Each structure stands twice: as C-alpha cells, then as structure tokens.
Amino acid sequence: AAPDFRIYWDNAYSIHHLYDENQDFLVEILEECTKAGNPDIVYKFTSTSKVSFPGSGIAAVAASKANLEDFRSYMQIQTIGHDKLNQLRHVKFFKDLDGLHAHMRKHAAIIRPKFELVLDTLEKELGGLGIGEWTKPHGGYFISFDSMEGCAKAIVAKAKEAGVVLTGAGATYPYGKDPKDSNIRIAPSFPTPEDLGKAAE
C-alpha cells in the first residue's frame, strides 16, 4: 500500500446485538495494526447515532497517539466547542457501559422479532431453491440478500411495482455498483410487524 494509505473503520454497530447470547464481535483493528507495526494506519469511528438520537448522538474516534494529536490540531480550529449539554444528556441517561447495553437490549426486543419474521419468510419461500442466499445476522440493522447474478435490480423494481420499497440494489457497494447485480440490503427495522409480514410474503 502507499505510505499514506489509511483505514477509516466505521464501527457503527459495535453494541447493536440482537441476542444476549450468540453475539458477534469484530477484531480489534487498532490493536492488530499496532501489533503489525502500523499503529498510524487506522482511525476508528463510532457514535450513538443509532442508539439515542439519529444524527444527534455522541461521536468518538480512536487512533494512535500520533494520529490523535494530529486530529486535535485540526479540531481545535474547526469548532469552538462540542455540544456539552448533549454530552451531559447522554451521560445522565446511559450513565455507563452497562446502561448502554441495557438500552440496546430494549432495541433488540423491538427489532429481533422483525428480523426473525423476514428470515423465516425467506426460508419458507426460497429455502432450498438455489435462487438466493442471505445472512442470518446476530446484530446490526440489515439482512444481506444475494440473488442469482444479474437479478437484484429487477427484483427491487418488481417489488416496487407490488408496493414494497426496498433499498436500492447494490447499495452496499462503492457508488452502488455491484458487479454481479445480486446484492440487496434488507432493512426490517422500520415497518410495523404487520406491514413487514405482508411485505416479506
């Protein structure tokens, strides 16, 4: 890689587990880069945007000491100060890491049945047919569905004709360009269970 190559690691779903057991955890990339002799190659970002208030949460960055010093030198002239009242609101509400986890269990109780409904419908309608594969996530907000090659855009269009609006085909790829035109990101968290059941069928 080029000497100035950097990894910007968006760890948005680090505490978004659907289950109390059977949780997935990502490798601690900053630690691994440090072990490999490249501590300055990575910046890790996270926020409470999908925990408390969308677009109005508390953000955080983790990086090497050198990168944080560099980062602070820019930040101190880009802003006169962070929203300390919002920070205080978050601290008073969540209190600590246990408070965050307790809150996220409430999220999981709401969205887990929606995920299970979609996954059960996919298995019932498409299981064993060899025309699609899908993830069975333990957390986050999406199910990744892979259709047969060249079909994703057509599936999304047909679903829209039937009154079901899906995320655009290939949305998970850079610039939305899926070379196989097979990936659809399913987001079951927003609809009501009743609407979701109809849409999934």
Each model region followed by its residue ranges:
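Short beta-strand segments
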Residues: Y8-N11, T46, A60-A62, T135-K136, ...
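Conserved core segment of the aminotransferase class I/II
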Residues: E31-R112
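Active-site pre-lysine segment of PLP-dependent enzymes
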Residues: A1-Y8, A12-P54
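PLP-dependent enzyme catalytic core of the Aspartate aminotransferase-like
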Residues: N38, E161, G176-E201
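Conserved glycine-rich beta-strand-loop-beta hairpin in the small C-terminal domain of fold type I
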Residues: R105-L119, I131-D146
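Helix N-cap motif at beta-to-alpha junctions
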Residues: M148-A152, P191-P193
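A common structural junction motif
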Residues: T79, E161-T167, E201
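Short, solvent-exposed loop/turn elements at beta->coil junctions and helix N-caps
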Residues: T46-S49, I131-G132, G170-Y175
